[in-house]
Design a protein with these regions (language model features):
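Terminal accessory/targeting
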Residues: 2-4, 17, 41, 211-213, ...
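Helical scaffold of the NTase/Pol beta-like nucleotidyltransferase catalytic core
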Residues: 6-71
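Conserved catalytic core of two-metal-ion nucleotidyltransferases
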Residues: 40-63, 110-190, 198-203, 214-236
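Active-site nucleotide-donor binding segment shared across nucleotidyl transfer reactions
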Residues: 59-92
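Residues at the C-termini of beta-strands that transition into short coil/loop
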Residues: 73, 98, 149, 194
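Catalytic metal-binding acidic patch
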Residues: 83-105, 187
């Protein structure tokens, strides 16, 4: 007889006990991080075999849209720290601004073989045009599109972290609005935040120049808000 342990009351109760027990919780968290790193490294092998051919196509498409955009998170970190993609990275990250974002962007990326797979968003419907993160893929290479908001003084976006119970924690990250500039990366003029090192230090801390295999955004230094009930997810 086959038992579905994920719907078994004993298993679910044991899992809840272990996860909330102060002695066993750190062990479970360490195992979770180890699984995440192993999965990421496997994806990184595929990513690095193809990214040097695919990246110029994506940049060219972004340039054709006539909107402000920039590389961010791990893609920016690799560009500034290593002048290359991070060895253990398995996707790209781009930012656009909510005042220029439009839903038809998905059609534009479809023209180069990237289809929108799913998106994260805020549950609070009173917050308009804020908090979107979209995932695109051509089957091998993936990129995240973060929709930033901006004011005269600041820019901010939301990131989402899923726990083992599939609950999404929404994390608001904020930086000073310093504008954008272009740098040469992979032989291309690529937009980045002005003062990119300051942008990275705000996010990753003063040790941003030292590689760290495992990272999640709860470790960020520029969190302005964190909420375990506000994240939502949908397939597109």
């Amino acid at each position: 007889m086959t038992v579905d342990i994920y719907n078994n009351r004993f298993y679910c109760g044991l899992k809840s006990f272990l996860k909330n027990n102060p002695v066993t919780r750190p062990v479970l968290m360490a195992l979770r991080k180890r699984r995440a790193v192993k999965k990421q490294l496997a994806g990184a092998q595929v990513f690095h075999r193809q990214i040097h051919q695919v990246f110029p196509l994506v940049i060219k498409k972004f340039d054709s849209l006539g909107i402000d955009y920039f590389i961010c998170f791990g893609t920016l970190l690799g560009a500034i720290r290593e002048n290359d993609f991070i060895k253990h990275d398995d996707d790209l990250e781009f930012g656009v601004f909510s005042d220029q974002y439009y839903s038809q962007l998905a059609w534009k990326f479809d023209e180069i073989g990237f289809k929108k797979q799913y998106r994260y968003y805020l549950a609070d419907s009173s917050i308009k045009n804020e908090g979107f993160v979209e995932k695109y893929s051509n089957g091998q290479i993936h990129f995240d599109l973060f929709v930033y908001s901006r004011s005269t003084d600041n820019i901010w976006c939301w990131s989402y972290l899923k726990d083992e119970s599939n609950v999404l924690t929404a994390i608001k990250l904020q930086w000073p609005n310093s504008g954008l500039q272009r740098i040469i990366f992979q032989g291309l003029e690529v937009p980045v935040p002005r003062n990119p090192k300051g942008f990275l230090e705000a996010l990753y801390g003063k040790g941003w120049s030292k590689p760290c295999v495992y990272w999640d955004d709860t470790m960020a230094g520029n969190i302005s808000q964190i909420d375990k009930t506000r994240g939502r997810f949908e397939h597109v």
